[in-house]
From Swiss-Prot:
Catalyzes the cyclization of GTP to (8S)-3',8-cyclo-7,8-dihydroguanosine 5'-triphosphate. Its cofactor is [4Fe-4S] cluster. InterPro entries: Aldolase_TIM, Elp3/MiaA/NifB-like_rSAM, MoaA, MoaA_NifB_PqqE_Fe-S-bd_CS, MoaA_twitch, MoCo_biosynth_MoaA/MoaC, rSAM. Belongs to the radical SAM superfamily. MoaA family. This is GTP 3',8-cyclase. PANTHER family: MOLYBDENUM COFACTOR BIOSYNTHESIS PROTEIN 1, MOLYBDOPTERIN COFACTOR SYNTHESIS PROTEIN A. Residues 13-249 form the Radical SAM core domain. One of its GO terms (biological process) is Mo-molybdopterin cofactor biosynthetic process. Its EC number is 4.1.99.22. Gene3D superfamilies: Aldolase class I (3.20.20.70). Keywords: 4Fe-4S, GTP-binding, Iron, Iron-sulfur, Lyase, Metal-binding, Molybdenum cofactor biosynthesis, Nucleotide-binding, S-adenosyl-L-methionine.
Length: 339
């Protein structure tokens, strides 16, 4: 029996509050990136039936319940969220929820050019674009032969025109795969107002072939960049920010580093994730989720009570104990959880 915590502050077993919700609106993707959804493991026709995904009504109720227990930051993920039909309609509904201070979306950018204006008009405030290479052939290869860098760059340009003037650009760096793209990416985005962030290759899921030797640490990346463009550390924007921020000494913006492997940040993790079919994951490295649909059927208040109970027993800190523990269960794939 889970405790009744309806009147208590929303904290897990380590005193961590819940402030950030990553909400997957679709599990399907038009790319097949090797570290997430490799083509040899995930067929092109993979995906849930539409009626298995949470409806817009369910998603709105779910977000309202999360806001009731403390969430202020909402990020829509996938899969590729721009594949979700009528997404701007959903965004308009979510943007109207009182208490949501930040509404963002993560995309591979291939479909962004045609949707950027509608997303902005609907109330989306920020966009993060995943981009692991600038070189066209390598980009195509890393996306499983599905993506073209020109499409993504066009999407970024369209987002700028629509009023998204400060995008985040995420790059997952893998040794001997795309580490030679780090400096070209920095050179491309310096001075644009966008924030490039380098993410250590993580052991999320079980089909990406992760091994420690493939990780290029943030410290190594920072040293390479600093040797070309001197950097100075910046303070975090808020408690729980995952990226270590550094400013270019010449004033041409900043770059970030997400160091889940080499410098775990579990102690400040304030995030929950919900999959497109309504399962709650309290850690990106989870081996199982919790189906929220029964509680969701009880309405906003019933779900909020359930979330308080679930969060109160959260004790996840996988990245901190990665080296000293072995997984007993197969981890859930990142494209199902929603990175």
């Amino acid at each position: 029996m889970l405790p009744d915590l309806s009147a208590a502050p929303m904290q897990d077993r380590y005193g961590r509050p819940l402030r950030d919700l990553r909400l997957s609106v679709i599990e399907a993707c038009n790319f097949r990136c090797g570290y997430c959804m490799p083509a040899d493991r995930v067929p092109d026709d993979y995906g849930l039936d539409a009626d298995q995904r949470l409806s817009f009504d369910q998603l709105e109720t779910l977000v309202r319940a999360f806001v009731a227990v403390g969430v202020t930051k909402l990020r829509l993920t996938g899969g590729e969220p721009l594949l979700r039909k009528n997404l701007p309609v959903l965004i308009q509904r979510l943007a109207a929820i009182e208490g949501i201070e930040d509404l963002a979306l993560t995309t591979n950018g291939a479909l962004l050019a045609r949707q950027a204006v509608a997303l902005r008009q609907a109330g989306l405030r920020r966009i993060t674009v995943s981009m692991d290479a600038l070189e066209p052939a390598l980009f195509r290869q890393m996306s499983g032969g599905r993506g073209e860098i020109d499409q993504v760059l066009a999407g970024i340009a369209a987002a700028e025109q629509a009023g998204f003037d400060r995008l985040k650009i995420n790059c997952v760096v893998q040794r001997d795969v795309n580490e030679d793209q780090v400096l070209p990416l920095v050179e491309h985005f310096r001075g644009t107002g966008h924030v490039l962030r380098f993410i250590e290759f993580m052991d999320v899921g079980s089909c990406n072939g992760w091994r420690p030797e493939a990780v290029v640490t943030s410290a190594q990346l920072r040293d390479r960049i600093h040797a070309r463009w001197p950097l100075a550390p910046l303070d975090a924007n808020y408690t729980g920010e995952v990226a270590q921020r550094h400013a270019f000494a010449d004033g041409l913006g900043e770059v970030g580093f997400v160091s889940s492997v080499s410098v775990p940040f579990c102690g400040d993790c304030q995030r929950a994730r919900v999959s497109a079919d309504g399962h709650l994951y309290t850690c990106l490295f989870a081996s199982q989720g919790h189906d929220l649909k029964p509680a969701l059927a009880e309405g906003e208040q019933g779900l909020a009570t359930h979330l308080r109970q679930r969060w109160s027993v959260r004790a996840d800190r996988y990245s901190e104990v990665r080296a000293s523990t072995s997984r007993r269960r197969k981890p859930v794939e990142m494209f199902l959880i929603g990175g």
